[in-house]
C-alpha cells in the first residue's frame, strides 16, 4: 500500500511540519486513516476507555470478529473486574493474578496485584483518594519502590546479607547531606578532621587509618604548593626586570631555572638569551649575570632555590622529556647534533630505540664550533673553492700603496 493512502498522524493533530512535501496523505476524504490502537492489540493500553484510538482485536486472537468502536465501552466495562484498578484484558482465558504482600517492595501498605500478561499495564496505575485511576511513569514507580525498600530494610532488617559484611559508608552524607536521616540503609560515618567529610567508619580502625594517611599526604602536598607559591610571588626577572607572577599572559608566568645557577629569570627571556647567534656558544650557555655555564634550562611554574629540590626538579624534567621524540633524530631520518647527551627519545618508526652516535665537532679558523653530521672529501673541496680571502686582498693593496709612496719619495729632487 502506498504511503499516500495513509493519513499523516501529525496532520491529524495539526502539527505536520513537512507540509506539501510530506510522504503521507493530508486529505481526510480519500485517505484511509489508521485509527486502531496498537497498544490494545498488544494487550497493554494504559488509557483504557479514554483512548482516542479504536480498540479492535487483531485477526486470529480471541473469539469472534473484531469488535466495533461503538460497542467498545460496553464490552470493556463488562469484562473488567469490580473495584478500582487498570482495565483488564477482554480475553476468554483469564489468568490468576499474582498478589505480592511484601510491604518492603511497595511504596505503601497495600498489596500490589500483578498479572502474567498485563504486568506492565498494572505497574502504570495507582489508586487515588477519590477512587479514580491515575497513571504514573515507570521512573516514579521504580523510585518509590527503591525508597520504600531501602527504608524497610533499615528498620525491619529484611536484608541479612548487609549485616554479614561491613556496611557501606553513606555517600550522600559524605557529599554533604543525607536526606534519609535515620531511615538511611547506609552507615553514617564520622567526620574527618583533615578533609571535614563524614567518611570515617566508626567500627573499622583500618579504614580510618588508611583514610587519615591519605588525607595527610594530600594535606602535605597542598602545604608545599602553598609555600612554593608564596616563595615565587615576588621574584623578579634579571633581564626584563618584571615580576614573573605579574606578567599579563598566564603562559609567561613561568620561570627558567638554570641547572648550575641560582639567579632568577623568566622562561621567555632566558630562552631568547640562549638563542642569540651572534654570541659565542660558551657565552650563550652561561648565566647573563654570573657567567656560570648551565647545560640546560628547566621550565617551572614555581621558583626553586634549594639544591635538593632543584635536583629533584632536574630528574623530573629529564624523565618527562625522555618520553618525547627528538625532532633532530626524526625517527632515524636525521642526525641529532647532541648525540648521547640528548635528553629526548631516539627511536625509529617501528618503536626500536636507537643508540645515538657521538657527535663530531669541527673548530673553524674563527673559533666557532660546528657539529659535523657527515664528513665527505667533496665538502672540503667545495668549501675551499668558495672561500673568500678579503684579508689577503687588503694586505696586497696596502703594500702597493706603501710601495708607490716610497718610490715617489725617492724620485723627488733634493
Curated annotation (Swiss-Prot):
Q: Where in the cell is it found?
A: Cytoplasm; Nucleus
Segments for region (Makorin-type Cys-His): 192-221
Q: Where are the zinc fingers (RING-type)?
A: 237-291
Q: Name one GO cellular component term.
A: nucleus
- Known EC number(s)? 2.3.2.27
Region described as Disordered: spans on this chain:
57-94
Q: What is its main location?
A: cytoplasm
UniProt-listed GO biological process terms = cell differentiation; DNA-templated transcription; negative regulation of inflammatory response to antigenic stimulus; negative regulation of non-canonical NF-kappaB signal transduction; nervous system development; phosphatidylinositol 3-kinase/protein kinase B signal transduction; positive regulation of transcription by RNA polymerase II; protein polyubiquitination
Q: In which pathway does it act?
A: Protein modification; protein ubiquitination
**Where are the C3H1-type-classified zinc fingers?**
2-29, 31-58, 164-191, 320-349
Q: Record's PANTHER family?
A: E3 UBIQUITIN-PROTEIN LIGASE MAKORIN-2, MAKORIN-RELATED
Protein known as: E3 ubiquitin-protein ligase makorin-2
Species: Danio rerio
Amino acid at each position: 500500500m502506498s504511503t499516500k493512502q495513509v493519513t499523516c498522524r501529525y496532520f491529524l493533530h495539526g502539527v505536520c511540519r513537512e507540509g506539501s512535501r510530506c510522504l503521507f496523505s493530508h486529505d481526510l476524504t480519500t485517505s484511509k486513516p489508521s485509527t486502531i490502537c496498537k497498544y490494545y492489540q498488544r494487550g497493554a493500553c494504559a488509557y483504557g476507555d479514554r483512548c482516542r484510538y479504536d480498540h479492535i482485536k487483531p485477526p486470529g486472537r480471541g473469539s469472534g470478529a473484531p469488535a466495533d468502536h461503538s460497542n467498545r465501552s460496553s464490552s470493556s466495562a463488562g469484562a473488567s473486574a469490580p473495584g478500582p484498578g487498570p482495565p483488564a484484558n477482554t480475553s476468554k482465558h483469564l489468568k490468576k493474578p499474582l498478589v505480592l504482600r511484601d510491604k518492603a517492595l511497595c511504596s505503601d501498605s497495600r498489596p500490589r496485584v500483578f498479572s502474567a500478561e498485563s504486568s506492565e499495564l498494572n505497574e502504570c496505575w495507582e489508586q487515588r483518594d477519590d477512587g479514580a485511576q491515575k497513571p504514573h511513569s515507570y521512573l516514579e514507580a521504580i523510585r518509590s519502590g527503591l525508597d520504600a525498600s531501602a527504608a524497610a530494610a533499615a528498620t525491619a532488617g529484611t536484608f541479612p546479607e548487609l549485616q554479614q559484611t561491613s556496611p557501606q559508608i553513606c555517600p550522600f552524607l559524605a557529599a554533604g547531606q543525607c536526606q534519609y536521616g535515620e531511615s538511611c540503609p547506609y552507615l553514617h560515618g564520622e567526620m574527618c578532621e583533615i578533609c571535614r567529610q563524614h567518611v570515617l567508619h566508626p567500627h573499622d580502625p583500618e579504614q580510618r587509618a588508611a583514610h587519615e594517611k591519605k588525607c595527610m599526604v594530600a594535606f602535605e602536598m597542598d602545604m608545599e604548593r602553598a609555600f612554593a607559591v608564596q616563595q615565587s610571588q615576588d621574584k623578579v626577572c634579571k633581564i626584563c626586570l618584571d615580576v614573573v607572577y605579574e606578567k599579563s599572559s598566564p603562559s609567561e608566568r613561568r620561570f627558567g631555572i638554570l641547572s648550575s645557577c641560582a639567579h632568577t629569570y623568566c622562561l621567555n627571556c632566558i630562552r631568547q638569551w640562549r638563542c642569540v647567534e651572534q654570541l659565542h656558544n660558551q657565552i650563550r650557555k652561561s648565566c647573563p649575570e654570573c657567567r656560570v655555564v648551565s647545560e640546560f634550562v628547566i621550565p617551572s611554574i614555581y621558583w626553586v632555590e634549594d639544591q635538593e629540590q632543584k635536583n629533584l626538579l632536574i630528574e623530573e624534567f629529564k624523565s618527562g622529556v625522555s618520553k618525547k621524540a627528538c625532532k633532530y633524530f626524526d625517527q632515524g631520518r636525521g642526525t641529532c647534533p647532541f648525540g648521547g647527551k640528548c635528553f629526548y627519545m631516539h627511536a625509529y618508526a617501528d618503536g626500536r630505540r636507537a643508540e645515538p652516535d657521538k657527535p663530531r665537532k669541527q673548530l673553524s679558523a674563527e673559533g666557532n664550533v660546528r657539529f659535523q653530521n657527515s664528513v665527505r672529501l667533496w665538502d672540503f673541496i667545495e668549501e675551499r673553492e668558495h672561500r673568500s680571502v678579503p684579508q689577503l686582498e687588503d694586505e696586497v693593496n696596502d703594500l702597493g700603496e706603501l710601495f708607490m709612496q716610497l718610490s715617489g719619495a725617492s724620485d723627488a729632487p733634493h
